[in-house]
């Protein structure tokens, strides 16, 4: 008989700080603290229900599983590995000291059954959990985790479309959840104003509180007046509007309003839990989702179709429009919008050249809980990468503008060679006592070689290999063999069930020689696998990078 399980608990979780261990080593303490940090009220979207971000992206399957995971991590030996199956601890096995302390598999389904309908059946029976990307892999750091990637996207869009200057320009988008909440700050850092539509007032309040959003408008007329004023003044200010994007975008099209950039980060990947149908209140949406899920999904997807038609109308008028990876184009196509993919996704439009060089989201977390540890590592990054003014500008803006959520953390986009250099330097700082406690290095699953997602990261690959998911599997296996502290393999993150597979990695810098050896392997091999993947697809930039870095790619030959 299956035991009872609970997804709600009226409790606040915060990660321990300082140097006192709750587990038997820092390699076990780190995943313990990062799991708990994912559920910090400053970090998670709905922590009392274990939801970190992305609709129903959870850190653990239920509270009973959370309790047992914590117990396992506290008692895990230095040569044991904990196995997590969709948020549930299922085994502890003797491995070796250089093996991962935790191996995680979340939301993975045999392809024929990889649908939201089947997943929700399993979820209701307590047999599955949606891990999103960094929710179930315990390395979410709040909206900062996506800010720089969003910033890089907006900057590149400005370079391509507006000569590199977004002053006096404005972005139209929607969604202020765990991912979309980065948009207003990223836009203003890039020099543009932004109008962000969000249907939940609580999310607007949270972004205002954390400084990611500057202000809120009373209604659409007020929002447009504010944007017009800030554009005229050459100021970059973000404005939130509590409304439904499925209503607002068609109305803007009707009025002939012309934004300078248009995208979307609503939770369109999950129509049952993340996208409000037109004319519904949020309370009605949640009630009807529980009572009549099929009708709710249908209503949400109809609204998405109207949303995408409005985006297409902007595109047809010459406005740069791009999909930001929530699969809204696919949902619209399912509803009969045959030209939904006329505007591109953000990766082929703006990011892929970075992936070809193994450049992606590199993040680290100070287990001490001390902000000063992050500031010291910021300075070390600048010393080790002295000739990248764009990176230095980012680090300066991040320190000035980004408020830490939970444990202090930092993200910056760096590539092959740079990641290992930084990781080894951080480990040496721990060894010398320059940092109060060890740091954890991780990344988003959205990275160069760790994801297969034909409507997002691997859209429009040069060789047509968009849907080949061997690559994230190889990435996870390679990071496991290389000695990462924990490794995760997920399905459905970002774009929903059936549309992606992706892998995550984290490694602890505890100041030991053993850690240095693991760091050198993992932080070289992880981005190198991304260069390999893109070189195999025929990208000249990746082939050149592979040769420059001396990667052994047997089939590369003289291509």
Swiss-Prot record:
One GO process term, biological-process aspect: L-histidine catabolic process to glutamate and formamide
Record bears the keyword Lyase: yes
Lineage: superkingdom: Bacteria
Protein name: Urocanate hydratase
Binding site for NAD(+): 54-55, 132, 178-180, 198, 203, 244-245, 265-269, 275-276, 324, 494
InterPro entries: Urocanase, Urocanase-like, Urocanase_C, Urocanase_central_sf, Urocanase_CS, Urocanase_N, Urocanase_Rossmann-like, Urocanase_sf
Family annotation (SUPFAM superfamilies): Urocanase
Active site positions, chain numbering: 412
Pathway: Amino-acid degradation; L-histidine degradation into L-glutamate; N-formimidoyl-L-glutamate from L-histidine: step 2/3
Subcellular location: Cytoplasm
Organism expressing this protein natively: Azotobacter vinelandii (strain DJ / ATCC BAA-1303)
Cofactor: binding details: Binds 1 NAD(+) per subunit.
Cofactor: NAD(+)
Cited Gene3D superfamilies: Urocanase like domains, Urocanase superfamily
PANTHER family: UROCANATE HYDRATASE
Record keywords: Cytoplasm, Histidine metabolism, Lyase, NAD
Record's function text: Catalyzes the conversion of urocanate to 4-imidazolone-5-propionate.
Enzyme type, top EC level: lyase
GO cellular component, one term: cytoplasm
GO molecular function, one term: urocanate hydratase activity
Enzyme Commission number(s): 4.2.1.49
Family in the record: Belongs to the urocanase family.
Enzymatic reactions: 4-imidazolone-5-propanoate = trans-urocanate + H2O
């Amino acid at each position: 008989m299956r035991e009872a399980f609970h997804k709600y608990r009226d409790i606040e979780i915060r990660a321990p700080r300082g140097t006192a261990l709750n587990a038997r080593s820092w390699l076990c303490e780190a995943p313990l603290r990062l799991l708990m940090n994912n559920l910090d009220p400053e970090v998670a979207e709905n922590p009392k229900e274990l939801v970190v971000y992305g609709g129903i992206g959870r850190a653990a399957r239920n509270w009973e599983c959370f309790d047992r995971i914590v117990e396992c991590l506290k008692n895990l030996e230095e040569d044991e590995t904990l196995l997590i199956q969709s948020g549930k601890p299922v085994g502890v096995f003797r491995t070796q000291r250089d093996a991962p302390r935790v191996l995680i598999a979340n939301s993975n389904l045999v392809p024929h059954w990889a649908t939201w309908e089947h997943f929700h059946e399993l979820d209701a029976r307590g047999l599955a959990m949606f891990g999103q990307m960094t929710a179930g892999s315990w390395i979410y750091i709040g909206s900062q985790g996506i800010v720089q990637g969003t910033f890089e996207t907006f900057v590149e869009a400005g370079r391509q479309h507006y000569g590199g200057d977004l002053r006096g320009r404005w972005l139209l988008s929607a969604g202020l959840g765990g991912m979309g909440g980065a948009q207003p700050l990223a836009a203003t850092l890039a020099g543009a104003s932004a109008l962000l539509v969000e249907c939940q007032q609580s999310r607007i309040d949270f972004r205002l509180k954390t400084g990611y959003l500057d202000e809120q408008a009373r209604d659409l007329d007020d929002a447009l007046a504010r944007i017009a004023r800030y554009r005229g003044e050459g100021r970059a200010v973000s404005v939130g509007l509590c409304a439904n994007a499925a209503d607002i975008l068609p109305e803007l099209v009707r009025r002939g309003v012309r934004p300078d950039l248009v995208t979307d980060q609503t939770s369109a990947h999950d129509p049952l839990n993340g996208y409000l149908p037109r004319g519904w209140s949020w309370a009605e949406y949640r009630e009807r989702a529980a009572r009549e899920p099929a009708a709710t999904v249908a209503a949400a997807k109809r609204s998405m179709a109207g949303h995408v038609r409005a985006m297409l109308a902007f595109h047809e008028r010459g406005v740069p429009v791009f999909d930001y990876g929530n699969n809204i184009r696919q949902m619209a196509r399912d509803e009969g919008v045959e030209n939904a993919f006329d505007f591109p996704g953000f990766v082929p439009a703006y990011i892929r050249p970075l992936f070809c060089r193994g450049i992606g989201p590199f993040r680290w977390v100070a287990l001490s809980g001390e902000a000063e540890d992050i500031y010291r590592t910021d300075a070390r990054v600048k010393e080790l990468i002295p000739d990248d003014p764009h990176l230095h500008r980012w680090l300066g803006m991040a320190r000035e503008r980004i408020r830490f959520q939970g444990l202090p953390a930092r993200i910056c986009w760096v590539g092959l060679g740079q990641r290992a250099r930084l990781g080894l330097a951080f480990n040496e700082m721990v060894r010398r006592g320059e940092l109060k406690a060890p740091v954890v290095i991780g990344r988003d699953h959205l990275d160069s070689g760790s994801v297969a997602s034909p409507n997002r990261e691997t859209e429009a690959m040069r060789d047509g290999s968009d849907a080949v998911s061997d690559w994230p599997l190889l990435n996870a296996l390679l990071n496991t063999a290389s000695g990462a502290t924990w490794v995760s393999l997920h399905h459905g993150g970002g774009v929903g069930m059936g549309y992606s597979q992706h892998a995550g990695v984290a490694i602890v810098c505890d100041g030991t020689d053993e850690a240095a050896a693991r760091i050198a392997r993992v932080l070289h091999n992880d981005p190198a696998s991304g260069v390999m993947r893109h070189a195999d697809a025929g990208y000249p930039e990746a082939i050149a990078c592979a040769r420059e870095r001396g990667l052994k790619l047997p089939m590369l030959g003289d291509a």
